[in-house]
A protein has these predicted regions:
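Positively charged n-region of N-terminal signal peptides that target proteins for export
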Residues: 1-5
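Bacterial N-terminal signal peptides
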Residues: 7-18
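N-terminal secretory signal peptides
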Residues: 23-85
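Short, intrinsically disordered, mixed-charge
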Residues: 53-57, 98, 102, 157
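Short C-terminal domain-edge/linker segments immediately following a structured domain
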Residues: 66-67, 94-95, 114-119, 142-146, ...
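Surface-exposed, polar helix/loop patches in the mature regions of secreted/periplasmic/lumenal proteins
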Residues: 85-140
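C-terminal partner/receptor-binding element of secreted or periplasmic proteins
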Residues: 128-164
């Protein structure tokens, strides 16, 4: 009798494992971001200036800046440029947090400038559209979230195009 129980238990464990794995959606990290390479004639410094100008024109404040590559270089680690820019409209951020404090984990909006091994730079941000769709926001907050998404993409596009 014990011989039958072991295979049955093992079979049940395998079936349960397969069910759990099938029921758990996998998330490809690449699907959660938007990437925009800089145009060939756009320097990294011009891209940064363009993003800052566009953000200012759209009333989004640059609330934080992290030149990660400088920190790495100060530790003796070779690094191409890795710079993280954080933009925010404080009023919208507060409204989102008031609705659901979990949104605070996604604030402020971040754009990373990443210089590749070939010197080509890319701007990368979280795909806000992916999260907006699943957030079950009331209509007024949905409108504001879409505005944030569009503004961040506009800031990125200005940087990618060198739109001074």
């Amino acid at each position: 009798m014990k011989i039958l129980k072991l295979p049955l238990a093992l079979t049940l464990m395998l079936v349960l494992s397969a069910f759990v794995n099938a029921a758990t959606p996998s998330l490809n990290i690449g699907d959660t971001v938007i990437k925009m390479p800089l145009a060939e004639d756009v320097s990294i410094d011009d891209a940064i200036t363009s993003m800052k100008l566009r953000a200012n024109n759209l009333n989004f404040k640059l609330v934080a800046y992290l030149p990660l590559y400088k920190e790495l270089q100060s530790m003796g680690v070779k690094s191409k440029r890795i710079e993280i820019f954080q933009f925010c409209d404080a009023r919208i951020a507060k409204a989102m947090i008031d609705f659901n404090p979990d949104f605070s984990a996604y604030l402020p909006c971040r754009i990373t400038l990443l210089e590749g091994p070939d010197g080509q730079a890319t701007l990368i941000t979280m795909n806000l559209g992916m999260f907006i769709e699943s957030a079950n926001l009331p209509p007024d907050l949905l409108k504001q979230a879409i505005h944030v998404r569009d503004t961040i993409q506009s800031i990125m596009q200005a940087g990618a195009d060198g739109d001074l």
